[in-house]
Amino acid sequence: MPYTKRYAAWCAAMLLASMGVHADEARRNWGNDPFLQISTALPACPEPLGPRQTEREWLAEAHYRVERGNSCWVEGRCRLSNAYRYDAEIAQAVQRRIDTIEPATHWREQSSLWLLLQRRFIYVQGCVAPGFDKAKFLFELAKTADVERVIDHTTTDAHATSLPYKTLADPLRQPADASE
C-alpha cells in the first residue's frame, strides 16, 4: 500500500512538473512565416501571437501544413510546388502595396496592425479606429500579387475581453472567432 501512494505521488509530481514545462515552453516562428507590424497608431492594442508556436504545437501542425501547402500545386492553382513558398515574395509585394494605398485609406494613422502571411493568405491582426474604412483597406490589400485570400482578425476595442486573434501576452486564450 505505501508503494502505491508513493507511486501516485510521484505521478502527480511528474504531471505537475510537465505542465509547468509546457506552459513556459519557448515560442518561435518555426516556419519562418512573414509577420510584419505595419502600424502603431493605437498604442493600447495587444500584440498578436502571430506565427510563434511551441515546438510541440509546430510538430502537431506539421502534417497539416504540408497538406495545405501542397494542395494548390496538386489542384493546379499554384506555379510553385508549395503555397508557403510564395510568402517571402508576397511580403515584399505587400510592403509596396500598403505604401501605395496609404493616401487613399489612411491606415497608418488609424490602426495598429500586424500582417501574418501563410500559404498565400494574409491574416490582418490588430486594432483599427472605429471610423476606419476596413473594407476598403482589405479590398485593396487583396489586390497584392499572388494573394489568394485576406482574413480580417481586427477589433475596434483594444480592451475587449475576447479578441479575434491570440495574443502574445496570453497565447493560450482562444480568439473570439476561431473559425480560421
Map each language-model feature to its residues:
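N-terminal targeting leaders
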Residues: 2-13, 20-180
